[in-house]
Amino acid sequence: MRISRRTRTSRTAAAGLAAAAAVLTLVPATAAQAAPAAAAAPVAAAAPAPVSAAASTSAPGGNAAILGIDYGTWQREVAAIVDAARPAIEQRIAASPAGEKPALVLDIDNTSLETDFHWFWTYPTPAISKVRALTQYAHARGVAIFFVTARPGIIESLTEYNLKAVGYPVSGLYVRSLPDLFDEVSEYKTSKRAEIEARGYTIIANIGNSPTDLVGGHAERTVKLPDYGGKLS
């Protein structure tokens, strides 16, 4: 099934607005939820599969469950892709010359957060542990972490809170303001990466789950996570 860029944009905006409405009643209770589930540590040490199939074969909820996307399969595919990309990123970080300002750029929904695998009232939305671990590793070594999302500006503060609450370092967050809504998502995201470069940063990797997150250049390498033909936002 192919989903147009306009449909994807509308779905992202609608989901964001729904989340904003739900959070107004849920924010007082978020403190107890802020710590992410401790899944990352056993993953690296466990047997071959990075995620237990018995524990994760079905999604907790959300659009992914409605569409029949298997949660455990998705987690394993994401883990395999990030694990394959990480050595080159680590080497690039280690080779950064003095004075360089390296940066990672990430999409948010189903790239940094498990957005489509939880109902919109789940707040904060859990992090994707492998991606979070990569950003924490990079940030600890002087790499700036930028998020470029098609989410509307009305939920910028809620989005930033969510990212920080689940453990992401945030050097900058780009959301779609009113003028940006007239651009295709790919054009908007490309322009924001160009802005980051104009600030003196070198984008060593751009991570996303949709082609619209990755096309347009302005990054040394791209890392493509699964979107199952556009089923995931």
Language model: regions and residue ranges:
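Solvent-exposed, polar/charged alpha-helical surfaces in well-ordered, non-transmembrane soluble domains
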Residues: D83, P87, S129-Q136, S157-Y161, ...
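Sec-exported extracytoplasmic/periplasmic mature domains
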Residues: E90, A94, Q136-V143, G153, ...
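C-terminal cap/substrate-recognition subdomain and adjoining C-terminal extension
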Residues: V51-A55, E156-S233
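Non-catalytic pre-domain segments flanking phosphatase-related domains
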Residues: R2-L106
